[in-house]
């Protein structure tokens, strides 16, 4: 709101125009001299420059350089009708109606260069839109560069068919209605000097509501309302040494983190299990759950680049951090629950937990670029990422059933778990590329990448091998590429990766895969350009217990037509065809093996034609829109036609209006459809 008020005071500045033409005209007698024939001999400079004794000296001509330039777009969004599922609309679009500051962009310059030489300000989406930003950059040559960046995202996700066994009734058990805010500030001192200190601060926070599931003893899931709060602050500072042959950066930073979430429920709530267990139905009547996390970390970073010879560049980077966290958890619940391992029903439970963890984390990278010949480049890069977790959790659980007077009868003895475990993850990568310019038009690239690592992490709850699980990673990747410029108008780029893996971490990891990409661009003339793109991925894991297969393709064609520099008409269009097909084995509820399949065949198209109105070339109309349609496991259709109109009212003022129609539908989940018209109309002030 403060920003909007400040903008209102700035609007009058757009109305100020450059000095009137009458003030810039010369005096009548000066006009006559200026309009004299070119062949008339000019008077000597010393004579023409001397003013007459009886005439005062003329005032210097006013400067036409403006200290302020920019534009502001504001208007009102109107949604006259809406039909369909409001939660799906908010999960995909989430546009509201009312006054909006759609865009702000201006520049301030100080001719006297006092506090700053130049200041740039930009803002977008203010007034209630789900994504709004503000950005400021100020600089004074040789003294400082300051950048401030603010972003706010309203994230809503409550698709009824997701994580909801009762769909279309009930609600998404993984729902979110939160705001995420991010602020970044960077200050660089003495920019352009050999030694440049800098300071930076980052703040990221989230707050809002949601729905999550509470799971007692893996027997049932209960969807409960949740309050979400978290924030992270990062402080860093350092110095850069910049010389002709080498650059060095030394940085020290720290991070603080906190997360405070809580869930509560009162009243009878049934879980996802609809069938009875031993003749009884499980339910939840009350719940109070809280957990808090606090974390800190200090890190050190050093990086350097050097050019010892004209044919050799070297670089390296090292980062060490040691984050530490503490956790506190508690819950107390009443209802009808069961311990399947002892076939015992109980009416209440209480859990208390605390823990601490420490994670030394080391990351390093190094590499070089060597140019033994003008047409040949050799690039080598190596990186390693290693961290070790040391954790010590302490958890107590107690169960009760019924009451005897004021005495709660224990249903089962309290359990206490005190664990000490560690996790270790090591990741390494080495890559070599050779790039050869075979001719002035043809460049070839070949390379090899080797990825290896090992990990020992906390196992899942159904693990039969103990609390920890170990794995290894070995992957060999071949690389190839081609860049061919047949003429100034035609260029082609090809890239390929082929891999064979001995060990992987996850069932769906890249294993034996091939990935390719092709791009082509042809410019028929100065007005017409066509671009094409093709990508493909084929990943296979033939392990008899996995049998994972993933095939994905994407083909796109785009056209840009701008005759006569788009003064009267321009056209942009793009069509995209994509397919995804995957299969993998899994174990069902009774350990019966089955196959999970997913398929999606999609078509996406976008087009926009801009036309200058007859007799009013400054007025523009845009006709176009986009659509998405897919067939397969989740068939869906999404249409967005649009019309835009921009009409100049006077030199610095434009009237802009836009209409869009949003239509979304699914064949299998028809209750998730919505349709709406959205209008926005407003003005643009320009100076």
Functional labels for PLM-detected ranges:
Residues 1-16:
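Sec-dependent N-terminal signal peptides
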Residues 50-70, 77-687:
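Gram-negative and organellar
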Residues 16-61:
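Compositionally biased, proline/threonine/alanine/serine-rich low-complexity intrinsically disordered stretches
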